């Protein structure tokens, strides 16, 4: 295979909000450059979204890559490396890795919907990575498309000159050849020194049953060849390279990858944990001293417990999580036991969509039936003895008398909404203890910035936002800092026994409402037993809400015909004693639905 000069390589990513046509544009680029024949493309959409769940939800979760060959109008042959990045806020880490491997971005905006909140976040990521950005307006063939208005919006909101934005319809292929020319003329080539020591960026890694761990790399300097001994600078692990190649989107083997090229390697790596995303790869025999800048390990933001409904599935769940961890560096888990739910795992996620997707993948790919406990965030606690601790599980909270102060994480949220729903959106943010920072208008849409406690967002904020705005509002957030908060630990007691899986940290002002809603829900779903079951919500020793499940009535006097009243009384007293004893020692069966419903309660 002939080596293409570095000036003829273009590494670019496509940045867009969910559902603005990013993966469809990628399909067209692959088709036009001959990456896949029309026959192979037939009946296939979103070629790069390999997971079913990605296609169904219309979202990209893993960053994908493909190499395309293109002969431009100037008669030269070019190599395009396209990185298809996720668009959702939870996967911002995957976006930042992919962007670091590229020099330019195509900003795809739906001409009928305009700029959305996550478009903004991802564009800022691209600008931070020093990218040249080419605006592309998609879906211009729709009757609702307003390209001029959207161009103006790109200039007003993002501050990019959109006068020469490329107009396309990715679905029909209209204007897509112009995108290819714009990539050649408007995006810069990579820089790199072929003669230098190997320096490469680890962009992503996943597990393949036959090949072991497949590592996606972007070579910065030097050459990566078969048989070479490489070292991961972050973990210090060394390996011999077995295969080198790239995706077209099919795996294609080559002898070496030069500077500026993006491809994959395999090296008999058993654990994806050894290949930290964002790590620097170098030659083991003459390593470089400085790592590539700007990468940090992904830090989980939202935590929740996952427990198998059937206790026998515990080992299957452990193996399944291990497999998902292979493909998802940002998912973490540790073992946890719960008196109510048995053995399970405490898992850390990047955000709520990430949590939902992991849950769905566990149930789909591994056929597991799971219960998830209430999501929580990391709280910092200053104790009276001067020490500080961090907890993300309410069960680990120390005694109240030992705590001097609790701090909770806050986020800055950017919400874009049509102005007719602004009132409902502001009320929602206000109810969630938000502080409004700014409000600006972009055409007929309002852009609001709010400071909100993350604790209030992880439950159901996104769903509520979509329902108050009829699905039109878009939302993006980033963590800002920790602030002191008046938080209390609320426990749910069933028959005077605390149910650890339902305990949570809530703000004092919201505790009563949430507690009442949870006990009412539990009352509906716990079946009657032979004895009375009190369901209580408590903060410390104080009960803030109570409901009672009535006992089943068993008529012990049925066998007495007439006769002496003392006989009946004796039987009733005996039953009373038995019920009292049963209440002391009896176990209440809490059905799974009761847990799930209590955790989904909206206060």
From Swiss-Prot:
User: Residue limits of the tr-type G domain?
Assistant: 7-191
Membrane-topology annotation of the record: Peripheral membrane protein
Q: Where does GTP bind?
A: 19-24, 138-141
UniProt keyword annotations, A-Z: Cell inner membrane, Cell membrane, GTP-binding, Hydrolase, Membrane, Nucleotide-binding, Protein biosynthesis
- Asked if the keyword Magnesium belongs to this entry, the reply reads no
Q: Name one Pfam family in it.
A: LepA_C
Q: Which domain of life is it from?
A: Bacteria
GO BP annotations of the record are: positive regulation of translation
Q: Which SMART domains match?
A: EFG_C
Reaction(s) catalysed (UniProt annotation): GTP + H2O = GDP + phosphate + H(+)
Please give an example of a GO cellular component term from this record. Answer: plasma membrane
Any one GO molecular-function label of the UniProt entry:
GTP binding
What does this protein's UniProt record list under function?
Required for accurate and efficient protein synthesis under certain stress conditions. May act as a fidelity factor of the translation reaction, by catalyzing a one-codon backward translocation of tRNAs on improperly translocated ribosomes. Back-translocation proceeds from a post-translocation (POST) complex to a pre-translocation (PRE) complex, thus giving elongation factor G a second chance to translocate the tRNAs correctly. Binds to ribosomes in a GTP-dependent manner.
Q: Which family does it belong to?
A: Belongs to the TRAFAC class translation factor GTPase superfamily. Classic translation factor GTPase family. LepA subfamily.
Q: What is this protein called?
A: Elongation factor 4
| Organism from which the protein derives | Rhodopseudomonas palustris (strain BisB5)
